[in-house]
Amino acid sequence: MNLIKDTDQEHVCIFGGDYIYRMDISQMLRFHKKREADLTVAAIPVPVSEARHFGIIEVDENLCMTGFVGKPQISPRTMPGQPYMLLASMGNYIFNRHPLEDKLQQDSQDGQSVHDFGRDVIPKMYPGGKVYVYDFSQNHIPDAQPKEAGYWRDVGTIRSYWEANMDLVGIEPQFNLYNQQWPVLTYNPPFPPAKFVHFSYFRTGHATNFMISPGAIISGAMVKKSVVGCNTRVHSFSHVNESVVMNNVVIGRGCIKYNSSKGVETIHLSQICNRKSTNENIEHICIIGSVCVSCNQRIRVYLK
């Protein structure tokens, strides 16, 4: 509360930190001001079949919030004019300062509250306040492709984190990091450029549909459809496919690291093994970080 009270700003923006998306927040703020809202919630359209995975917001024809259902088992009210689509909350909010202060103060004195925005604070605002929903799919980003509109990923699980990384490596990626009109700014570590070494028929550093970070060396190995972190070494005769390799990893000679994640219920977080002992039927998501693996080692970590 002190962070809000110590400022004289009229609006307070609260955005989730474990999501991936590209957004011009000023467009949402203009929407908020135009409707003179106390609260504006960002949402994405999702098919009715996916409702159980999200918190679903119900709205009227003016996008005024009329209800909220957390991960419903039956279909709630659909979007006006779109009978097969629902609005899923993104966890991004713009508040007017004074209504937010009032509701937080009330919530702090509620012994039954768990002090969660989605569960406790927002449901107390929309029945009597001016709460609107901003359709994120209408947010315009310069030079973005049509299929990028509304891209949003929750990366709060291992599977969703892996899927978001795989979204980056396509020829025409769903989330394009190469948009010079709207770059994604990040820290660049002081490592040299990535390097591919060895050139022979059976031993060539080779990679396709991949993203590789500074300081990485692909030494006579093959990397396909993967994201490779900084200061990583992949040694000769190793294969890395559909995987996320974190920073400072060493993969020894003759290792295979791959993914085949169709229809998986038990997720193997990582498996690196010698090619001769690989079970080709094993299906898993492959993520590895901060380890050194050599030939004939097998690592298997299960997600409970």
Language-model features and meaning:
Residues 1-172, 264, 296:
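Unchanged
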